[in-house]
């Protein structure tokens, strides 16, 4: 039996270890998700980053449980992340949403549960529509609830105490929101997940968060690539990072692919990454992004690519002012 690669981990402030490289479940097709997760586990992946909003947690759970049943991996060797969607921020709905996730995954607990966005949509019952996405109970119209983030956070803290979640964290939060949340929290966020690629580097946010003892996971590591199939005009009008001369020249120098350079750029700075791939060779390549180091010149040249270009901005949904 072939040995699976050893993946470095980040020690979280909750005491747990989170793998530095994982498999992202966003936009993984329901028809193929179970097999993709199972094959990723066989390849050596241990971190799986999912969410209620992705609509594929049942299938992700099937892949996980098949691998556990076959003895490929033990549950405690996996690190499973999910995220609380915007319609479930009211404290009375938080556990209901988590229970739905646990039921779909067919697991007793998740390793990490994040607030997906600092946005409280109007509650939609699970039996009415799940996942609700942008549905707020009234066609295409957005409706909101007056739920402070700290109230949602306190509900998550109770679920840590109940043993249903090992670590709690946040996603798509700005420095000011984190600064405020920490002052009211009993349990500090273990992880911040953010959009992170050379076109959107956010160095001050990263410096603040890492100094505060909060680990960072970057999503959309390949920049516009993730958003092309969504027909995002911003992505379609942006040069792909895979073809960018700076990235290509660094890749050629190290004998690596542009994707590996983009992932190593993050992991070398202790930022976890969660790429996905259907291709077995790329799956393995994405996992082996800690066996080489970028030089200071490489890092300096990539730093010059930052133009503050964000592809995932709720302002585009309904003028929601998270990042204004």
From Swiss-Prot:
Record pathway: Carbohydrate metabolism; D-xylose degradation
EC number: 1.1.1.307
GO molecular function annotations of the record: D-xylose reductase (NADPH) activity
Swiss-Prot/TrEMBL keywords: Carbohydrate metabolism, NADP, Oxidoreductase, Xylose metabolism
Catalytic activity from the UniProt record: xylitol + NAD(+) = D-xylose + NADH + H(+); xylitol + NADP(+) = D-xylose + NADPH + H(+)
SUPFAM superfamilies in the record: NAD(P)-linked oxidoreductase (SSF51430)
GO biological process, one term: D-xylose catabolic process
UniProt cross-references to InterPro entries, sorted A to Z: AKR (IPR020471), AKR2B1 (IPR044486), Aldo/ket_reductase_CS (IPR018170), NADP_OxRdtase_dom (IPR023210), NADP_OxRdtase_dom_sf (IPR036812)
PROSITE patterns noted in UniProt: ALDOKETO_REDUCTASE_1, ALDOKETO_REDUCTASE_2, ALDOKETO_REDUCTASE_3
Active site per database record: 54 (proton donor)
Superkingdom of the source species: Eukaryota
Site, as annotated: Lowers pKa of active site Tyr: 83
Role played: Reduces D-xylose into xylitol. Preferentially utilizes NADPH as a cosubstrate.
Family: Belongs to the aldo/keto reductase family.
Designated name of the protein: NADPH-dependent D-xylose reductase II,III
Source organism per UniProt: Candida tropicalis
């Amino acid at each position: 039996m072939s040995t699976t690669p050893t993946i470095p981990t980040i020690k979280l402030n909750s005491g747990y270890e989170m793998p530095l490289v994982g498999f992202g479940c966003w936009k993984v097709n329901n028809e193929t998700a179970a097999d993709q997760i199972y094959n990723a586990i066989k390849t050596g992946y241990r971190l799986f980053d999912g969410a209620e909003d992705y609509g594929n947690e049942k299938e992700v759970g099937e892949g996980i449980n098949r691998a556990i049943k076959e003895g490929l991996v033990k549950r405690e060797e996996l690190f499973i992340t999910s995220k609380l969607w915007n319609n479930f921020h009211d404290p009375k709905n938080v556990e209901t949403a988590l229970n739905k996730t646990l039921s779909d995954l067919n697991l007793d607990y998740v390793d990490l549960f994040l607030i997906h966005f600092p946005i409280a949509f109007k509650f939609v019952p699970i039996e009415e529509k799940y996942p609700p996405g942008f549905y707020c109970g009234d066609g295409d119209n957005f409706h909101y609830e007056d739920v402070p983030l700290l109230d949602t956070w306190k509900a998550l803290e109770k679920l840590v105490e109940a043993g249903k979640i090992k670590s709690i964290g946040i996603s798509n939060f700005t420095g000011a929101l984190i600064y405020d949340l920490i002052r009211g929290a009993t349990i500090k966020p273990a992880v911040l997940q953010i959009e992170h690629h050379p076109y959107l580097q956010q160095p001050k946010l990263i410096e603040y968060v890492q100094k505060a003892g909060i680990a960072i996971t970057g999503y959309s590591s390949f920049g516009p690539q993730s958003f092309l199939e969504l027909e995002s005009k911003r992505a379609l009008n942006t040069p792909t990072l895979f073809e960018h001369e700076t990235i290509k020249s660094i890749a050629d120098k190290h004998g690596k692919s542009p994707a590996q350079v983009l992932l190593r750029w993050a992991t070398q700075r202790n930022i976890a990454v969660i790429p996905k791939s259907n291709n077995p060779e790329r799956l393995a390549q994405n996992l082996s992004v800690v066996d080489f180091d970028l030089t200071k010149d490489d890092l300096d040249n990539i730093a010059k690519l930052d133009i503050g270009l964000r592809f995932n901005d709720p302002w585009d949904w309904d003028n929601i002012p998270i990042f204004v």
